[in-house]
Amino acid sequence: MSFDFDLFVIGAGSGGVRAARFAAGFGARVAVAESRYLGGTCVNVGCVPKKLLVYGAHFSEDFEQARAYGWSAGEAQFDWATLIGNKNREIQRLNGIYRNLLVNSGVTLLEGHARLLDAHSVEVDGQRFSAKHILVATGGWPQVPDIPGKEHAITSNEAFFLERLPRRVLVVGGGYIAVEFASIFNGLGAETTLLYRRDLFLRGFDRSVREHLRDELGKKGLDLQFNSDIARIDKQADGSLAATLKDGRVLEADCVFYATGRRPMLDDLGLENTAVKLTDKGFIAVDEHYQTSEPSILALGDVIGRVQLTPVALAEGMAVARRLFKPEEYRPVDYKLIPTAVFSLPNIGTVGLTEEEALSAGHKVKIFESRFRPMKLTLTDDQEKTLMKLVVDAHDDRVLGCHMVGAEAGEILQGIAVAMKAGATKQAFDETIGIHPTAAEEFVTLRTPTR
């Protein structure tokens, strides 16, 4: 049977574009359909614009700290419109880069909504195409709980396009997106409250990291309200919002921002026309090769719900392209030791097991931990402290986990992730000469276990 394409990719996000480009490079006839924006969540309403806003939010501290170093530039003023305008231009530039990457790779780009008609057919805005393989890489979408007044709330999708910076913001959620945006709004000068229905945010991260970040965010004036949740949202006559909590309290705000989870983007995808099955949580079920229950259809990225991170989707896209069209170069994605960062202020960087995970897995561990005031702040009144922590297997000396809260934690942990991937032991850390004076050298000078 002949097909229009060897591979038809639905979704031009990080994973879909990676799979399409490399499949085309391996000689396959490839098409990509995208209904919204090139680059997916990461480029448009995720990692990239968020990191730009994090940079913007940190300047208030930079200006204040500069005074201790002899700099005086008058009173700093922030303009939201300038930041958002410049951010938009950068995203448009990146959209163009993604377009060029696809076109220059020989990929057919179709801008429109794609819908599955059967196991080998896709319709894009009335046009029908056939493909030997179809890859679903449609990503995820933020969700807001079904409460009265939820139409007054926003998510990360809308936050990047607000016309003005809200004066008072309620951020609802306890995951990394909630913590990052609470840091952003707080750093830019908004009166910010973070509400979370449990006793401490960032479930799944090391307990020491969670508690340390809680304390540091509190120092910066962020109002943290745990064991709290919103029951309803009402719009006031003056346009402000009144959020009634489940305990009866009412909090007033100009913006209620929800970061309470994401769902797979499967709307009107036509899965009912195929044999594709979903998991209990609504993600597309796949095997170790990203194969769905329909032999000709594959899926990757956020839509399969494994590890919802851009670099993971990129690795999955590469694996799919190689397995289908260059099998001699195929290597499965290794989901162990995936480094992660949270771009809160201060940042979190982490790789490997938490202390709790190591103990649950039966490891006898030694914990090395240090909390210190970074050198940059010693001339200032800023009392922010950095946390560095190593979780070490007491039996074979292997470093099981590395965790940090502090400036540029993600940059530091990326390098350590390579060492841990190579099986680094605590002895290897001890024998490594540090770069002085840096914060990073603390990881190779931790000598005495704290427990």
UniProtKB/Swiss-Prot annotation:
It is found in: Cytoplasm. Its main location: cytoplasm. Its cofactor is FAD. FAD binds at S14, G15, E34, T41, C42, K50, A114, D302, T310, H436. Binds 1 FAD per subunit. Keywords: Cytoplasm, Disulfide bond, FAD, Flavoprotein, NADP, Oxidoreductase, Redox-active center. The active site is a redox-active disulfide bond. Belongs to the class-I pyridine nucleotide-disulfide oxidoreductase family. PANTHER family: GLUTATHIONE REDUCTASE. This is Glutathione reductase. The gene is gor.
